[in-house]
Design a protein with these regions (language model features):
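Alpha-helical transmembrane segments of multi-pass integral membrane proteins
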Residues: 136-191
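Hydrophobic core of alpha-helical transmembrane segments in multi-pass integral membrane proteins
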Residues: 34-49, 108, 113, 183-193
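Membrane-interfacial loop-to-transmembrane-helix junctions in polytopic alpha-helical membrane proteins
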Residues: 22-29, 85-95, 121-128, 160-174
Length: 204
């Protein structure tokens, strides 16, 4: 029997690493780890990432940030880069490649921990749903490295690639769609846990 036929009969073989990662977070996540991850997220955002962002901040800029908007075009990207010095653009490249990419991983782990806690009693039904936040992280990384590539090109010749700009914009839009989905999943999970607790209480 071929390996392909075995995989078709047993999908868990094909998606083994994904399933193991999902089970790991369901097993290890608890209120303490989720609160710890949330504290790391808040501390990194307030005391570190914000400071790194000020390195390329321009007073009264028409476009203060690209990554926080729901998509953007070539005009917005060019306007953003044209307002900044070469040193600011280099800082922006470093910000996207290192600090903001690390931030994405931090918030991804935090959201995965919370989703894992909320859906732990239903883990066999919802499967790898707890890994949904990592999809947001993935597209955040696509956006970051696309913006870094565009910034490097702008420094080199003053232009940007339309195809790379489209990748950056599309990745940003998809990132925010997944963000809304994650918040929706967390809300549904919280409601399910509250309703479940109320039912158990009424049965006593």
């Amino acid at each position: 029997m071929s390996s392909k036929s075995i995989e078709s009969k047993n999908p868990s073989i094909k998606f083994g690493p994904l399933i193991r990662a999902s089970q790991f977070f369901y097993t290890k996540s608890n209120l303490i780890t989720a609160l710890l991850a949330t504290s790391v997220f808040a501390g990194y955002l307030l005391f570190f990432l914000t400071g790194k962002g000020k390195a390329f901040e321009v007073a009264n800029s028409s476009i203060k940030s690209l990554g926080t908007s729901l998509g953007f075009g070539q005009v917005e990207i060019l306007a953003f880069l044209a307002e900044r010095s070469d040193q600011m653009i280099n800082d922006y490249i470093n910000f996207n490649q290192v600090w903001d990419s690390l931030f994405a991983l931090i918030y991804g782990v935090m959201y995965v921990a919370w989703v894992s806690i909320l859906f732990k009693p239903y883990s066999k039904k919802v499967g790898v749903l707890n890994l949904l936040p990592f999809a947001q992280v993935l597209f955040d990384w696509f956006e970051n490295f696309s913006l870094a590539t565009l910034s490097k090109q702008f420094l080199a010749d003053g232009t940007i690639s339309s195809s790379t700009a489209l990748i950056a914009s599309t990745s940003s839009s998809i990132k925010w769609v997944f963000s809304l989905l994650v918040y929706g999943v967390i809300l549904v999970g919280a409601v399910m846990r509250i309703v479940g607790a109320m039912k158990r209480r009424s049965q006593r």
